[in-house]
Curated annotation (Swiss-Prot):
<dbReference type="InterPro" id="IPR036910">
    <property type="entry name" value="HMG_box_dom_sf"/>
</dbReference>
<dbReference type="GO" id="GO:0002089">
    <property type="term" value="P:lens morphogenesis in camera-type eye"/>
</dbReference>
<dbReference type="GO" id="GO:0030900">
    <property type="term" value="P:forebrain development"/>
</dbReference>
<dbReference type="GO" id="GO:0000978">
    <property type="term" value="F:RNA polymerase II cis-regulatory region sequence-specific DNA binding"/>
</dbReference>
<dbReference type="GO" id="GO:0005634">
    <property type="term" value="C:nucleus"/>
</dbReference>
<dbReference type="GO" id="GO:0005654">
    <property type="term" value="C:nucleoplasm"/>
</dbReference>
<feature type="compositionally biased region" description="Gly residues">
    <location>
        <begin position="26"/>
        <end position="44"/>
    </location>
</feature>
<dbReference type="GO" id="GO:0045944">
    <property type="term" value="P:positive regulation of transcription by RNA polymerase II"/>
</dbReference>
<dbReference type="GO" id="GO:0021521">
    <property type="term" value="P:ventral spinal cord interneuron specification"/>
</dbReference>
<protein>
    <recommendedName>
        <fullName>Transcription factor SOX-1</fullName>
    </recommendedName>
</protein>
<feature type="compositionally biased region" description="Basic residues">
    <location>
        <begin position="224"/>
        <end position="240"/>
    </location>
</feature>
<dbReference type="Pfam" id="PF12336">
    <property type="entry name" value="SOXp"/>
</dbReference>
<dbReference type="GO" id="GO:0001228">
    <property type="term" value="F:DNA-binding transcription activator activity, RNA polymerase II-specific"/>
</dbReference>
<keyword id="KW-0010">Activator</keyword>
<keyword id="KW-0804">Transcription</keyword>
<feature type="DNA-binding region" description="HMG box">
    <location>
        <begin position="51"/>
        <end position="119"/>
    </location>
</feature>
<dbReference type="Pfam" id="PF00505">
    <property type="entry name" value="HMG_box"/>
</dbReference>
Length: 391
């Protein structure tokens, strides 16, 4: 506190004091302000273990002045008193400072006499450095996902993305001409020509979010299908007819896929999606394939059979789109991983699949309404039951 004032005393021309009195912070010794007796420390039992530094000329002068100013201004803070005392000491002449300088010399000589081996050791100031916790958005969502509210957080994000994707699909100029067909694992690898750039930007953003969700051990996202950048191990073939980025319905599936192991989609309770709006239902329907790809072996045949009620309630909530939407797949059963022709046929239009009657019937249905059917057929095929295609 008094370092500025001591520097002033150091630069005074009449100050013939030793550097010991003038260097270093004076607040560490001398009694600080109005107390403490002039000579060496160790006068009381409390101060016997630590010897204080001798006071300099400014401290000798300010000791009486501080007490006087504190009596005149009882509400004034000690720091304000020190500032005023320092300003007054600067404007004082050498003749006025001389008696205090001589007194400081005497005190220093007495201190050296009492403590010949004294060496100034500055007191260590322990400053606790506060570490700031820097959490990114993904880290915050991971922390929320570890607790009970992870499903609600991911569901809120997925509903917003799904609603935006549905609106963008209906408004895109090339929406009726694009060829987007559901993959057997829920990955749709097509994009509408009217908004390829928007879909690519959205896919890049969702890849980062999926990285955060997929790497969380509690969310079950360590599945090889959870990362959109990894190639599917069951489908190593290329798609020359579909060079566009991922389908925008994949955005909702990416958000819903990490929480499929929790009580989200396979809980056999249709009341979970009973009150959601049309955009949210569309996002939930688009997430059907994503929920299938991350569901573990723990989803037994009973859970698959019970989930048909939830799928039926979900399908009734979804409104049909205009008739210009792309045709739905002709069949919805899950093919064997080794059958390459069966897998390729999932990407071809329904008219080329060899079943024109089924293609004409499926063309009237909605893209969103066909996704629950595809999921039902795939889930039933995995569990060894009959595909429920009549819903």
């Amino acid at each position: 506190m008094y370092s500025m004032m001591m520097e002033t005393d150091l630069h005074s021309p009449g100050g013939a004091q030793a550097p010991t009195n003038l260097s270093g912070p004076a607040g560490a010794g001398g009694g600080g302000g109005g107390g403490g007796g002039g000579g060496g420390g160790g006068g009381t039992k409390a101060n016997q273990d630590r010897v204080k530094r001798p006071m300099n000329a400014f401290m000798v002068w300010s000791r009486g002045q501080r007490r006087k100013m504190a009596q005149e201004n009882p509400k004034m803070h000690n720091s304000e008193i020190s500032k005023r005392l320092g300003a007054e000491w600067k404007v004082m002449s050498e003749a006025e400072k001389r008696p205090f300088i001589d007194e400081a010399k005497r005190l220093r000589a007495l201190h050296m006499k009492e403590h010949p081996d004294y060496k100034y050791r500055p007191r260590r100031k322990t400053k606790t450095l506060l570490k700031k916790d820097k959490y990114s958005l993904a880290g915050g969502l991971l922390a929320a996902g570890a607790g009970g509210g992870g499903a609600a957080v991911a569901m809120g994000v997925g509903v917003g993305v799904g609603a935006a994707a549905v609106g963008q699909r209906l408004e895109s100029p090339g929406g009726a001409a694009g060829g987007g067909y559901a993959h057997v694992n829920g990955w749709a690898n097509g994009a509408y020509p009217g908004s390829v750039a928007a879909a690519a930007a959205a896919a890049a953003m969702m890849q980062e979010a999926q990285l955060a969700y997929g790497q969380h051990p509690g969310a079950g996202g360590a599945h090889p299908h959870a990362h959109p950048a990894h190639p599917h191990p069951h489908h190593p073939h290329a798609h020359p007819h579909n060079p566009q980025p991922m389908h925008r319905y994949d955005m909702g599936a990416l958000q819903y896929s990490p929480i499929s192991n929790s009580q989200g989609y396979m809980s056999a309770s249709p009341s979970g999606y009973g009150g959601i709006p049309y955009g949210a239902a569309a996002a939930a329907a688009a997430a059907a394939g994503g929920a299938h790809q991350n569901s573990a072996v723990a989803a037994a045949a009973a859970a698959a059979a019970a989930s048909s009620g939830a799928l039926g309630a979900l399908g009734s909530l979804v409104k049909s789109e205009p008739s210009g939407s792309p045709p739905a797949p002709a069949h919805s059963r899950a093919p064997c991983p080794g059958d390459l022709r069966e897998m390729i046929s999932m990407y071809l239009p329904a008219g080329e699949g060899g079943d024109p009657a089924a293609a004409a019937a499926a063309a009237a249905q909605s893209r969103l309404h066909s996704l629950p059917q595809h999921y039902q057929g795939a889930g039933a095929g995995v569990n060894g039951t009959v595909p429920l295609t009549h819903i």
